[in-house]
Design a protein with these regions (language model features):
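Structural signature of alpha-solenoid helical repeat junctions
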Residues: 51-52, 122-129, 168-171
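Alpha-helical junction/boundary sensor with strong preference for TPR arrays
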Residues: 83-90, 160-164
Length: 188
């Protein structure tokens, strides 16, 4: 019995070492100059510009205001993906600062950072617009009666919204409450 336990332990330990060795080999084989992920994103979304993304938003807003819910949902989905990609590209312009060590960041002067601040600000604005788009997609699906997609997008929208986006937070919360048939007054 002791031999079986001992052999089992040896086999288990050997298996764990093999898995560890495989993980180490994978991390060592990552090419820091590999741009395949970036090319994949560009292939998927193209290279968005401020103007093209603004046009997408305007189109989605017009469809939303005209209560063309299905078309608006699809337009906001395209817009949300593209404005998110634009936010990522703008944020990348500030990446050397964020990738720097704590000491290097601490020693970087404001005058050095000042030209990069608008990129970070615009990226944050794009993310905020993406968050709002997710709420609007959820509302569109709610209005079409597609509660599965409504819940999914409202859930993600609420996950992404910041606390200062109170109007959309409230709208999303109210839509979720209606779908879930949750009456705040009755729950008191």
């Amino acid at each position: 019995m002791k031999k079986i336990i001992f052999l089992s332990s040896v086999i288990l330990a050997f298996g764990c070492l093999q898995l560890k060795a495989q993980d180490t080999n994978k991390s060592e084989s990552i090419d820091p100059l590999d741009i395949s992920k970036q090319m994949e994103q560009i292939e998927k979304y193209g290279v968005p510009t401020i103007a093209t993304v603004d046009e997408m938003k305007t189109k989605a807003d017009v469809l939303y205001e005209s209560q063309s819910w299905k078309e608006a949902a699809l337009a906001y989905e395209v817009y949300a993906k593209n404005v998110n990609w634009l936010a990522n590209l703008l944020s990348q312009c500030v990446e050397p600062y964020y990738s720097a060590s704590y000491d290097d960041r601490k020693n970087t002067s404001y005058s050095t950072l000042k030209p990069f601040i608008p990129f970070e600000s615009k990226a944050n604005e794009c993310k905020k617009q993406r968050n709002i788009a997710y709420v609007k997609i959820g509302l569109c699906y709610k209005n079409t009666g597609d509660m599965k997609n409504a819940i999914a997008y409202l859930h993600k929208g609420l996950d992404l919204l910041s606390v200062d986006e109170l109007s959309y937070w409230t709208v999303a919360k109210d839509a979720m409450a209606e779908i879930l048939q949750f009456d705040v007054e009755k729950s008191k």
